[in-house]
Amino acid sequence: MGIEGETVVLKNMLIGVNLILLGSMLKPSECRLEVTTERVQRQTVEEEGGASSYNTSSKEQPMVFNHVYNINVPLESLCSSGLEASAEQDVSAEDDTLAEYTGQTSDHESQVTFTHKINLPKKACPCASSAQVLQELLSRIEMLEREVSVLRDQCNTNCCQESAATGQLDYVPHCSGHGNFSFESCGCICNEGWFGKNCSEPYCPLGCSSRGVCVDGQCICDSEYSGDDCSELRCPTDCSSRGLCVDGECVCEEPYTGEDCRELRCPGDCSGKGQCANGTCLCQEGYAGEDCSQRRCLNACSGRGHCQEGLCICEEGYQGPDCSAVTPPEDLRVAGISDRSIELEWDGPMAVTEYVISYQPSLGGLQLQQRVPGDWSGVTITELEPGLTYNISVYAVISNILSLPITAKVATHLSTPQGLQFKTITETTVEVQWEPFSFSFDGWEISFTPKNNEGGVIAQLPSDVTSFNQTGLKPGEEYIVNVVALKEQARGPPTSASVSTVIDGPTQILVRDVSDTVAFVEWTPPRAKVDFILLKYGLVGGEGGKTTFRLQPPLSQYSVQALRPGSRYEVSISAVRGTNESDASSTQFTTEIDAPKNLRVGSRTATSLDLEWDNSEAEAQEYKVVYSTLAGEQYHEVLVPKGIGPTTKTTLTDLVPGTEYGVGISAVMNSKQSIPATMNARTELDSPRDLMVTASSETSISLIWTKASGPIDHYRITFTPSSGISSEVTVPRDRTSYTLTDLEPGAEYIISITAERGRQQSLESTVDAFTGFRPISHLHFSHVTSSSVNITWSDPSPPADRLILNYSPRDEEEEMMEVLLDATKRHAVLMGLQPATEYIVNLVAVHGTVTSEPIVGSITTGIDPPKNITISNVTKDSLTVSWSPPVAPFDYYEYPIDHPSGRLDSSVVPNTVTEFTITRLYPASQYEISLNSVRGREESERICTLVHTAMDSPMDLIATNITPTEALLQWKAPMGEVENYVIVLTHFAMAGETILVDGVSEEFQLVDLLPRTHYTVTMYATSGPLVSGTIATNFSTLLDPPANLTASEVTRQSALISWQPPRAAIENYVLTYKSTDGSRKELIVDAEDTWIRLEGLSENTDYTVLLQAAQEATRSSLTSTIFTTGGRVFSHPQDCAQHLMNGDTLSGVYTIFLNGELSHKLQVYCDMTTDGGGWIVFQRRQNGQTDFFRKWADYRVGFGNLEDEFWLGLDNYHRITAQGRYELRVDMRDGQEAVFAYYDKFAVEDSRSLYKLRIGGYNGTAGDSLSYHQGRPFSTEDRDNDVAVTNCAMSYKGAWWYKNCHRTNLNGKYGESRHSQGINWYHWKGHEFSIPFVEMKMRPYIHRLTAGRKRRALKF
């Protein structure tokens, strides 16, 4: 084994002994040691370039043995309380787990090194003597090592000799690498700093100055000293290895300080403006920086700015002395106000994260908030109460820090009243009704303003009134009606509507000055502006229909003519404007009985008047004849029955001769009588009668007569001798006899006597007388007519006693007729003679018994005139005259024509003709037609009649400028003077309408006609009682086009075209639309339709739409409109909300592009109507046709039919909600009952998170049953991710974001009412009702904010 081995064994034995001693030193009651030994052998090669003068083999390399001693002290035996604090501190100064002590022993000769490492647990044994025991153990180990060294020296003596003796001469000690072996001295010559037999012991300088122990060349100094040679005083904690110890004081390295260099030095020693604490300056107030050299800013600018000269220069978005406050918004302004919204704008910094808008009614109430992104500069607060003043504050928010608010006090407008309608409209009143408000306000103000802004009325009403009847309006006036809500000093926006009062008709209708054929109608004109006045009149009972006149306003009277005398009429008057007609005012009147016409005296005598007149048109039963002298002393009345035929005759008798009578004749009918037809007629003066010669002499003739009975002034006697020189004498009226004297002897005198009164002179009585004796010499014939003759003769002288007159036709002399005459008679009238017959007449004077020779004469009666003249076939320029022929033969007829111009034409008609037509007359002219017969040079008496030619008719009546509702009538005026034209307009569906046009016009515009209607127009002219012939024309109005063609709801590819139908019946419409690019399309639309939606249009294109109505082969004129389709706001919509903003307003299946990428398209069902539309429907249950009890894979990708029941897929939910913030709506229905649940946030995480559900705040009517599932992963029958003991999906036959297990189970079994098995929403129908209809839908949250449909309350 050798010395080396022995040494090793010995050393190990010694160490073991010492450990045993250590164990014995620890009392069992105090500590128990467990020692384990680990021996590690390692080989090292130390080369110190050139230090060794010999090369050694591997076995000469030093051997190092490491001994590790783990001393484990059981805790339960090391727990006394006597451990000193200092010992505890020493033990804990280094490692918190083990105290490690290392020692090394080297065998310099054998190149073996023993390393000893002892591990002791620190604080494992808090015994009172543990520290002391350990210290003693260390000392013993050191002592042991010194003893081993001495022992080794003894064992190594004569190593060379031993080697030589054993024959091992190749072994040379290494001298520990710190010297050279000398065979001469058989020992090592050590290098400087080393000593010992094998140079393995370092040399301690100065022998450690007697202040320590040299161990392995190093001084282990006493506790007060240090240094290589223990000559230096020790510094506290050896300056903590952070400085030099100089004379016991530490000269610390930078940046340390303190007596033991434990403390960090502060920069610049805090510039004298602070205290240094562990290297950090605690600056005085007002200073800052690493060295307190800088002026300090308050709160170090809160980390949101930099300090400059003690002042904080804040980052954008912050303000305040320490930059702790967020900069508030600026310039808060109100951009718009409505009744339920306020639009705000402000200016703010760019760094703002978001804005919080807080608003609350100023009178108190719920404070609500709204948050908007920080890049917004405005917001619209919606769903406010109308008419309230709100305190509004806007905060800027950065990193959840709110700024001071900028505030405003803003009042919402009062709401616009809704539902304005008119219940009752009359001429002067309008009853208005509107819907009430649900909020408090002061009252209403309603105003009626004429469209011309002239005048108007305003009324204020209580707030609980929602209807009002306004009186005192103007008829036919269009009013703008405004209803405004009032609150305090505020006025809401008005709701307006226009209404026109009913046009008033004429009032106070009065019929005056009614005559037999004319009635004068007066009325008070309507106050409204009207197009015309419609006057209708006709017989009561409807006989003959009604005549209608259109009269132009402001006419307020009209003379109705050509009435039937003695008839009961009804007249009504209304006003017309456009198609509106007022109520008619009507009254009845009876025309007067027309007076007899053409009153005339046939013959007259001194005591009688023969009267004749034309009968009245009225059905009079009799006539009342009233007559009296002009003095009116006494009235006489005679009732005369109506004569048969056109005339009635009567004779007034017992009249006063020579007196002028006033005669009035009235027609009498049913106790009523007409105005009288009057005339004055004078009776003849009563002639002195019975003029006789009572005596005669050669120079005188005595006369006697009967006194005239009437009033006269005197008598005038005219006597004319045969010499021809007449003489007159006036005799007072009271005389009845007179004697003419101084006459010529033997002369024949013609003596006549007349009674005179003023200029009136009676018929004369004549007598022939002779001075001396003279018989009747001859007969005088006068007044010869066709049936009578007047015979006169002279007085016989002396006068005869009686006279006998005989006469007979010449060929019938044997049948002479005799007439006895009084002797005083000097004339006689033979009546009843035959026309054109020669009569023989003789006169005999009887004197006593002596009869004179007869005086014979002959006379031929005249030819008789035509009889019964009548007029017929009267036209404007001709008439027909007919008559009965006379009895006597004649040659021809002659008729003169008295023209209005005064010219008299005469024409001859053969005697064989009894009817003749006279032509070339003037229209509307009065003619006197007379007719007599002529034989040779003899003419008969004339028969006469008066006649008016008819008016000539207007000519060339035509209708021009014909439109669907209008036509222009034109004509040529007749030759005669025209007062009015009467136009009668008729069509198949309406009775004739009569229009009165002024006589100076030659055209008339027809309006308000019916489209596509055939009209007949008849027309005649009137002038007084004359009416022209009728002319007529026909025309048809055109087919009217559709009206109000408009384009609305214009989107990118569609437009709604609507119109109002024409008035005429049609078969269909022809609609043509064309674009600017030249494309054109024609559609046939049913007649019942009034709108059509054009689909498939091009975007951003101008379109022209043409529409016309069609009936058979007829088409109306074109009506047109223009519109422009819109463009797509989003070319690749990523959700339904963007489709909606693109103008897609119909619910249905659409394609969305996730994140706007063409490669990520997805078919979805869009709900475009619910709550503003724009929802992606991602689940629907409605009929149970689709099985929802499926596995994980199905729920990931989705299943079902988008038009029916379906699940869109969890992957799709995640991809959609990852695009931004979405909101969720769940609609549920049970029959007519419908509820919804709304959550302002909705997201589904990805597959790695098992599609966890994230939802926001709830609102709605269904109750919040979904928040229970917040944050839960999705579970299916094959993926149980719930927290329940059972598999919820398996138990409840569904798949959901189950927890333990559910409060809503919208994917449960359809129609299953067992507890929790069906489609459940706990807060609405509980767990035992399966909801028959469910839709889950989502849309971007921003859509609600921009649409402003729902107000949300948000917390700070």
Swiss-Prot record:
Record-listed Phosphoserine modification sites: S723
Annotated SUPFAM superfamilies: Fibrinogen C-terminal domain-like (SSF56496), Fibronectin type III (SSF49265)
Coiled-coil intervals: 127-157
Domain of life: Eukaryota
EGF-like domain mapped to chain residues: 188-199, 204-230, 235-261, 281-292, 293-324
Description of post-translational modifications: Contains N-linked oligosaccharides, O-linked sialylated structures. Contains O-linked chondroitin sulfate glycosaminoglycans. Contains N-linked oligosaccharides with a sulfated carbohydrate structure type GalNAc-4-SO4 or HNK-1 (SO4-3-GlcUABeta1,3GalBeta1,4GlcNAc). The levels of HNK-1 rise and fall in parallel to those of TNR during postnatal development of the cerebellum. In contrast, levels of GalNAc-4-SO4 are regulated independently from those of TNR, rising late in cerebellar development and continuing into adulthood.
Keywords: Cell adhesion, Coiled coil, Disulfide bond, EGF-like domain, Extracellular matrix, Glycoprotein, Phosphoprotein, Proteoglycan, Repeat, Secreted, Sialic acid, Signal
Residues glycosylated per entry: 55, 176, 180, 198, 271, 278, 302, 391, 469, 580, 790, 868, 873, 1034, 1044, 1259
Key word Signal present: yes
Protein's UniProt keywords contain Glycoprotein: yes
Role played: Neural extracellular matrix (ECM) protein involved in interactions with different cells and matrix components. Theses interactions can influence cellular behavior by either evoking a stable adhesion and differentiation, or repulsion and inhibition of neurite growth. Binding to cell surface gangliosides inhibits RGD-dependent integrin-mediated cell adhesion and results in an inhibition of PTK2/FAK1 (FAK) phosphorylation and cell detachment. Binding to membrane surface sulfatides results in a oligodendrocyte adhesion and differentiation.
Name of the protein this chain belongs to: Tenascin-R
Species this protein is from: Rattus norvegicus (Rat)
